């Protein structure tokens, strides 16, 4: 277990020194605290007869879902340094198993072996050389792969506009491509006066009501003529069938 933990600590110190944000004393203090934390964590979860057992528990992982590894953060706090000063990648996974330590940069890349051990007799210099060789190789491949993909992407971006302008279309003009014609819309029929909205308000004033018709928009009663009883003047009498004027019957 000592060799595997030493490989992990060398791996982290190598990354921190490449970032060149911490002093040598701070890096050594961080390496010492991380070694003690991993030894305490792994001592009851180490199975040489079955290396895959407890692998998830021993794993050191940093990604978009877990941006800070708790063990590494604890080592930073115990050594009085900031986690951000380590300069770790945004996606990093370390599997610490008996006789082998593996790493993966990024969640979609392939894993590589940081160090493998056949016995516990290897000294720190040999472990440091193994970690350094593996780390130098993977970091160079990782950065060169990302840069080559960026160059391919930029080439594709440059080629696509040329392919379009090399074969112009004889049908469409630039003005048609930039400013397409507006669709033709049929005018809506005008609303009849007196239409009402659903909320009870009028859209327009209702037309005047013709003479003799009741006003449909109001609740007033329609006009009805009042019956008048005719009363004959004094001196005029009438029977059932005709009127009799006494002045007309007097002799002249």
Swiss-Prot record:
InterPro entries on file: Anti_prolifrtn (IPR002087), BTG (IPR033332), BTG-like_sf (IPR036054)
Pfam families per the UniProt record, alphabetical: BTG
Annotated Gene3D superfamilies: Anti-proliferative protein, N-terminal domain
Source species, domain of life: Eukaryota
Region (Disordered): 138-165
GO CC entries: cytoplasm; nucleus
UniProt GO BP: negative regulation of mitotic cell cycle
UniProt record similarity statement: Belongs to the BTG family.
PANTHER family, per database record: B-CELL TRANSLOCATION GENE, PROTEIN BTG3
Role description: Overexpression impairs serum-induced cell cycle progression from the G0/G1 to S phase.
Protein name: Protein BTG3
Lineage of source species: Eukaryota, Metazoa, Chordata, Craniata, Vertebrata
Gene: BTG3
């Amino acid at each position: 277990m000592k060799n595997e933990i030493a490989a992990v600590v060398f791996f982290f110190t190598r990354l921190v020194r490449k970032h060149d944000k911490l002093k040598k004393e701070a890096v050594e203090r961080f390496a010492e605290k991380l070694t003690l934390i991993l030894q305490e964590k792994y001592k009851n979860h180490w199975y040489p007869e079955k290396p895959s057992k407890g692998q998830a528990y021993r794993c050191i992982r940093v990604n978009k879902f877990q941006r800070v590894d708790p063990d590494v953060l604890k080592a930073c706090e115990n050594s009085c340094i900031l986690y951000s000063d380590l300069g770790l990648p945004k996606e990093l996974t370390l599997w610490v198993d008996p006789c082998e330590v593996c790493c993966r940069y990024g969640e979609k890349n392939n894993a590589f072996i940081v160090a493998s051990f056949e016995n516990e007799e290897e000294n720190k210099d040999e472990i440091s050389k193994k970690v350094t060789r593996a780390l130098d190789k993977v970091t160079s491949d990782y950065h060169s792969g990302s840069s080559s993909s960026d160059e391919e992407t930029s080439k594709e971006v440059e080629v696509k506009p040329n392919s379009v302008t090399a074969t112009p279309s004889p049908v469409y003009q630039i003005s048609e491509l930039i400013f397409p014609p507006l669709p033709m819309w049929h005018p809506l029929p005008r609303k009849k006066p007196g239409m009402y909205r659903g909320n009870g308000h009028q859209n327009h004033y209702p037309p005047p009501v013709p003479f003799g018709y009741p006003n449909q928009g109001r609740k007033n009663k329609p006009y009805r003529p009042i019956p008048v009883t005719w009363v004959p003047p004094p001196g005029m009498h009438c029977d059932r069938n005709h009127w009799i004027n006494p002045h007309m019957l007097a002799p002249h």
